[in-house]
Amino acid sequence: METDAPQPGLASPDSPHDPCKMFIGGLSWQTTQEGLREYFGQFGEVKECLVMRDPLTKRSRGFGFVTFMDQAGVDKVLAQSRHELDSKTIDPKVAFPRRAQPKMVTRTKKIFVGGLSVNTTVEDVKHYFEQFGKVDDAMLMFDKTTNRHRGFGFVTFESEDIVEKVCEIHFHEINNKMVECKKAQPKEVMSPTGSARGRSRVMPYGMDAFMLGIGMLGYPGFQATTYASRSYTGLAPGYTYQFPEFRVERSPLPSAPVLPELTAIPLTAYGPMAAAAAAAAVVRGTGSHPWTMAPPPGSTPSRTGGFLGTTSPGPMAELYGAANQDSGVSSYISAASPAPSTGFGHSLGGPLIATAFTNGYH
């Protein structure tokens, strides 16, 4: 009989592997638990049978689980190359428990501090947080190329209780700048499978990830300056915070001249010189720059390459908001701004290294 109770077919992270349980994929929407039990009953005695259903619509999700009394039933199912149920080919496999997902750390002695001003030093950070309790270590993450810190770092306190007190205040003021403080998390928590690493995004000039409020992604290489109470050596940090990776792509110039649609706008409309020059370009078939013709008076030139026209102050979201850009990024870039130059600020994607932490997370 179908059941609306919570379905135990999906194993909990700590469930041991049951060699008698099978995952059945590719089920027809019409397949019932009775039909599933009847089909697999020919291979052995079925102990448990489940068709997984949506808790709201009660519609089949297209897969289920079958547990045999002994492993011989599983072997017989696997020995048969093709299985068909309710006029649909199904895919039975041995079921394995889901791998445990890393859990967020709730008790820790280490905090992440982000949004520091460029003139803030590690001594400034340590001095500020000493008002909450004893600071064991403080560090800022540096770009080894420019030898300037990236605006964030970590502080380790003597006890977890001090961290709780610090994190009760989400934003702190250090050197006349509001900085963000949160509990540091292990790398496995902050960089799960399928993170945004490698996704191309463009950062507006003069803006960093803290201004955008974007989630943070682990940097491949940072070096850290640490407070003198303890030295850190080695690579591979135990903690990491997520920043998007950034790159600017420049569209190549087309090799052939780009001419307007001849039937729409006659070349003679632009004057004899323009018509002659365009005709000469067609004959030569070469040139380092494409020919472009101005649109008729009163029309608005289309924007190309995702950049604004030189006289349009439009919103930043239109400037950098490509169709495949994350909505989480574009939602923060909405203020009107004059069209920028092609120069960009310093890149966050340079060669960086990070030091290891010594509290068991690496």
Swiss-Prot record:
The modification N-acetylmethionine is found at M1. Residues 20-110, 109-186 form the RRM domain. Expressed in neural stem and progenitor cells (at protein level). Detected in olfactory bulb, brain stem, small intestine, and at low levels in brain cortex, hippocampus and ovary. Detected in neural progenitor cells, including neural stem cells. It comes from the Eukaryota. It is found in: Cytoplasm; Nucleus. The keyword DNA damage does not apply. The modification Phosphoserine is found at S191. The first RNA recognition motif binds more strongly to RNA compared to the second one. Belongs to the Musashi family. This is RNA-binding protein Musashi homolog 1. It comes from Mus musculus. The lineage of its organism: Eukaryota, Metazoa, Chordata, Craniata, Vertebrata.
